[in-house]
UniProtKB/Swiss-Prot annotation:
Record keywords: Mitochondrion, Ribonucleoprotein, Ribosomal protein, Transit peptide
Protein name: Large ribosomal subunit protein mL45
The UniProt record lists the keyword rRNA processing: no
Region ranges (Disordered): 333-357
A GO term from the CC aspect: ribonucleoprotein complex
Organismal lineage: Eukaryota, Metazoa, Ecdysozoa, Nematoda, Chromadorea
PANTHER family named among the record's database cross-references: 39S RIBOSOMAL PROTEIN L45, MITOCHONDRIAL (PTHR28554), LARGE RIBOSOMAL SUBUNIT PROTEIN ML45 (PTHR28554:SF1)
Assigned protein family: Belongs to the mitochondrion-specific ribosomal protein mL45 family.
Species this chain originates from: Caenorhabditis elegans
Amino acid sequence: MLGRALVRSFVQPTAAITTQLAGVHHHQEATDMKRFTGVTRSNKAKANRNTHVNEKLFRRMRGRKTLLIELPEDSAREKEAEMSPGEMRTELLKRGINPYKEAQPRVWNEAQVTFQSIYGIADPYVPPENPGSFTDVNNKFDEVKQRIQHKFYNWRMGTNRIRKKQGFEKFDIKTFCAKAEDIYVQAHRALEQRDKTAMYKYITEYAFAKMWPDVENGSVRFELISVLEPSRVVAVRCFDNPPKSGNDIAQITVRMHTRQKLAVYDRFGGLLLGSEDEEKDVVEYVVFENHIAVVDGEWRLHGKIYPKWIDAKQGMVGTQMLSAEQVEKQHAEAKALPLRTTEKLEEAKKEKEQQEI
């Protein structure tokens, strides 16, 4: 009987009782991000979701009737606005603030952004002028393949796409070379005269950033003597910037073989490059660009391409030619150079040995 009573007391089910657990949550903020950001409530029984997550932390601040905030006076702000950078640094040091340690000076890195030109050349490939020999079959096959692809892209991604734009339905490559030569000459004349208005008319923003430093602190002298070979179009490319935006930009690479004079001087009048008297035969691959997305787009000089087989450019002249009078004043007599420290010690040692003898 006693055993049955014990079994009934253990096995007999009783009514389920649910109790609410009220826990402090601010010790779980590091692990429970939803509770910390207020997405979930700390107290499930509370219907007020606007209660601050960490109530205990801000309880003392909410109990204060007033809060003292240090605000600078208007007169101090006016003085700071009139201070120079040196005076401002001294004032901050008086307050115990090191401006170069705790607050670094702001550095401005500004760059011009435009959508009527692209800062680069779309396709810098230029077919080689001298075709390879047939003995090297692999290289010859690759060369022929690249030439065929290049001609196909000139039509598919070049002239065909340009003629679809309004105002360029009658675009012809054969008549473009004469216009390219005129743009080339006008751009260099504007550069020689430092005329920014004319430069932006004949060159793009990408070319301006490269050409303007030559005349900003110096000068350029340019003269086109003659055109040795008729200019011809080498590559035609058309693309949109940004991609799939319809803002089409066209680039045409023209091979120009000319005889010209070019001289670059520094701000002191010293010759840096070239000569005003010497004529040179120059072969250049000049890139011209046009914002064909607009009807009134104009062709402008954009840059140059330097293939691998082309001759290296002339380096800058680091010396100046002396006149006959300056050469006569120069003394050609040999002079003994001052001795080095080790040589001086050896010489002093020898003199001491001779004195002892």
